[in-house]
Amino acid sequence: MDKIQKIMARWNAILPLSERDRELLSRRFTIDFNYNSNHIEGNTLTYGQTEILLLFGKIVGEAEAKDVQEMTASNVGLKMMKEEAQLKDIPLTQHFIRTLHKTLLREDYKVFRNLPGGQTTSYTIHAGIYKTRPNSVITRYGDRFEYASPEETPALMGDLVEWYNEAEKSGKFTPVELAAMFHYRYIRIHPFEDGNGRIARLMANYILSRHDYPMIVVRSRKKNEYLEALHKTDLTVGAAPSIGAHASKREIQQFLTYFSNLFVEEVSYNISFLTERGENVWWFDGERVKFRSATTSQMLNLMYSKPDITIPCLSENIGINIASVNKQIKQLTTKGYIQRASNGNWRLIITPSI
């Protein structure tokens, strides 16, 4: 039994989930996925801002309007993807991918760039339409990597969707292999002028969900691991976009290994999140949080059960002086674990397990 089979056996052992556990996991995934997928691409909303925006529709603190709109649209796209994944008798289409992209970008917009000599140029990013100009990326090693040309993109996307539908029917690949191969091939095409990374991560989860596998989050704090896995695979596959867009399972082995390990890690987190219980067990952005001081958990539990509790009352209940309470509050706030609402109530961003 390989590692994917082992982790799926552990996952299946805790099924069916209670309604409460399904809701808890769905809420955590919604925040984690949207925050991380957009943060990888430069969105500046904090984890706490993302949670409050998506759960309550409110903005806390300073935030760029573009980032707020982007995060809101991302959540709409996530919901759309999950609904489409349940239509298992309907094959994947290019139309769905383009519609998903239009949902993420919302509308066409112009990008302005300064040229040497003080001149300015601009071009239009099209929502839901394949690229009309070449795109490339400067890798972390300083070299330019070209994606498929606008002329070859429609045919390559047609090949990708056709391959996926046939591969799914054949049963030749596991859902994890399908998701990894689709992600890599899609990235090598880079069919749109913007939003390709976000679409790739949504589509990988579309494939997993379509086969009743847990969905995953590429954590922004591990962005370098993600990009390095893609880069190393590019070196193996070769620079030609048309070759990358048809890469075999053997050729993308390095990215498949990364993706498989990510899947195991994320499902392990889900299992722990749902099964570990206790007043000292806390969760934040895909990690189990342990505190050195027992008073920190006591403070968080009091804030959770009594959001309007005052600092003097926290001091009295925990048995430490007010200066120590304020010091811990500052540390928790800095890490993004807690916020204080405008009415003075405490809002926990970190998640309790009780």
Give short role names for the model-derived ranges.
Residues 1-354:
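FIC/Doc superfamily catalytic core
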